[in-house]
Amino acid sequence: MINTRKTHPLMKIVNNAFIDLPAPSNISSWWNFGSLLGICLILQILTGLFLAMHYTSDTMTAFSSVTHICRDVNYGWIIRYMHANGASMFFICLFMHVGRGLYYGSYTFLETWNIGVILLFTVMATAFVGYVLPWGQMSFWGATVITNLLSAIPYIGTNLVEWIWGGFSVDKATLTRFFAFHFILPFIIAALAMVHLLFLHETGSNNPTGIPSDADKIPFHPYYTIKDILGILLLVLFLMLLVLFAPDLLGDPDNYTPGNPLNTPPHIKPEWYFLFAYAILRSIPNKLGGVLALISSILILILMPLLHTSKQRSMMFRPFSQCLFWILVADLLTLTWIGGQPVEYPFIIIGQLASILYFFIILVLMPITSTIENNLLKW
């Protein structure tokens, strides 16, 4: 009997990616985040589609249309909060996924890693333009402040900002184009995710030991399909707890006030998942320097394969590197906290120290520690 799963042109692709895929037998729950990100993306596209059916991208009616969705549309409130909190879940999974890659040395798959960094930038761009759409105070001023950073680019900066705004300030043209970007970008993310997966399946998955696992592979289905389903159930549980019990926990109260160009909020800050980068941006007194530091804080991930000096791929058997890794995590949490605080003593100095430490750990301490560990292997 001919097995359609293995012969049908379309089914064959699905089969080779999700069913008969040879997977390492020892990958832990840290390898669940790829599938969780896929689920997050599907969820965001679906909830976003239903929101777009009722949303109007006009400065006069945008805020009212979001209120209308929450009050008058059948189950509009749950769709809106699933979309808003779904973004938070997306970023939690994203940070865990990147952290896993750093810890276990997955960045040695160069193409997969670089596409992943591009994906990270694209998701961040999507989240930023999406945050502007409800046209609340924080939406409006967040858009004004962040787009204004481009004016730090020498010579073309001011023209570039006005070109993005579609005028001399954030206004109707800006909102309309941001809605267009927010609609198209998730589909670009989906396409990039497929390329990401394509490159991953060229090499096969990494595993916690960092040692090639060709000698010990198991089929993806049923072993990892059932494991992924457990992860998805936990993700949905956590998301729905957030949506149904504390929908505004991660949001900003200022966004329940319609955007007003004549009234600036006392503390302008982005959503929690951008706070670490925002803290790095604010810790440098110079505008251009801050923008460069902001971009570098993410772009530094591309350098990870070059900074890898260890003879071992994974950090599993490298206790000193493990300590540094967790100090880096603590540093990022500190930056996230600082990003949400007002610009005053002692937060300014803490932010500056945390920013310096962030780059110092990645660029200096990690390569040196790896070299020391290499020498310890000879003892």
Swiss-Prot record:
GO terms for cellular component: mitochondrial inner membrane; respiratory chain complex III. Binds 2 heme b groups non-covalently. Heme b b562 binds at residues 83, 182. It is a multi-pass membrane protein. One of its GO terms (biological process) is mitochondrial electron transport, ubiquinol to cytochrome c. Keywords: Electron transport, Heme, Iron, Membrane, Metal-binding, Mitochondrion, Mitochondrion inner membrane, Respiratory chain, Transmembrane, Transmembrane helix, Transport, Ubiquinone. Its cofactor is heme b. Heme b b566 binds at residues 97, 196. A ubiquinone binds at residue 201. It is found in: Mitochondrion inner membrane. Heme 1 (or BL or b562) is low-potential and absorbs at about 562 nm, and heme 2 (or BH or b566) is high-potential and absorbs at about 566 nm. The cytochrome bc1 complex contains 11 subunits: 3 respiratory subunits (MT-CYB, CYC1 and UQCRFS1), 2 core proteins (UQCRC1 and UQCRC2) and 6 low-molecular weight proteins (UQCRH/QCR6, UQCRB/QCR7, UQCRQ/QCR8, UQCR10/QCR9, UQCR11/QCR10 and a cleavage product of UQCRFS1). This cytochrome bc1 complex then forms a dimer. Component of the ubiquinol-cytochrome c reductase complex (complex III or cytochrome b-c1 complex) that is part of the mitochondrial respiratory chain. The b-c1 complex mediates electron transfer from ubiquinol to cytochrome c. Contributes to the generation of a proton gradient across the mitochondrial membrane that is then used for ATP synthesis. This is Cytochrome b. It comes from Cervus elaphus nelsoni (Rocky Mountain elk). The lineage of its organism: Eukaryota, Metazoa, Chordata, Craniata, Vertebrata.
